[in-house]
Amino acid sequence: MVTKEDLIAFEDDIANLFNGGKIKAPVHLSSGNEDHTIKAFENIKSNDWVCGAWRNHFMCLLKGVPKEDLKRRILNGKSMVMCIPEHRIICSSIVGGIPSIATGIAWAEKLKSEGNHVWCFVGDMSAATGAFSEAWRYSIVHNLPITWIIEDNGKSVETPTREMWGFRHPAATFDYIYEQSDGIVWDTPNKMIYYRYTNNKFPHAGAGMRVQF
């Protein structure tokens, strides 16, 4: 069983390796969302698919990827494009790139009728894109076996999501399903899980030191 302490220790290890010049490619590190991610994974089965973006180390560990295997892949420059089909993990480093892929996988699972589910992790800014909106609505209309997990840290890189989009009313964002501060919301009818978190430990990319590849 992977614990919160395991997740934190892994990212700290990767941060030290990156700052030491051992990783010759970008990394995106997580912090502050350990409890929420662990909670979401309580419902994810081994045969389910997990789809995500470039910040994916937590979900890989919780899906069962061995720590040393994941570390090897990161050292080989694969942090942003973690596709491990044997563990049913698919990631995309393109903003808004994963929703359509996840939707396609969900269609395939529905046709196979084997009871498997797709869980797609996206950030709040990605969830504000047309690509997400189309895939999310499509999955509801066709009742696909997929759940969208929106991880809201309030920004894209350093751009505040709500400011950037000019949101003035809570219904214009996912605030309308947010019921408690620093909580996690399960919106089953809309195939959605939503939570907020703050990452004050790591920058958007890298680990806080300028590293020349």
Regions found by a protein language model. Name each.
Residues M1-P26:
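Cofactor-/ligand-binding subdomain signature composed of acidic, glycine-rich
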Residues V2, D124, G130, Y178, ...:
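Alpha-helical protein-protein interaction elements
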Residues T3-K4, L17-F18, S113-N116, W148:
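A short alpha-helix capping/helix-coil boundary motif
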Residues F10, F18, F41, F58, ...:
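Phenylalanine-focused residue identity feature
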Residues A15, K22-H142, E163-F167:
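Cofactor-binding active-site loop characterized by glycine-rich and histidine/acidic residues
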Residues H142-F213:
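Thiamine diphosphate
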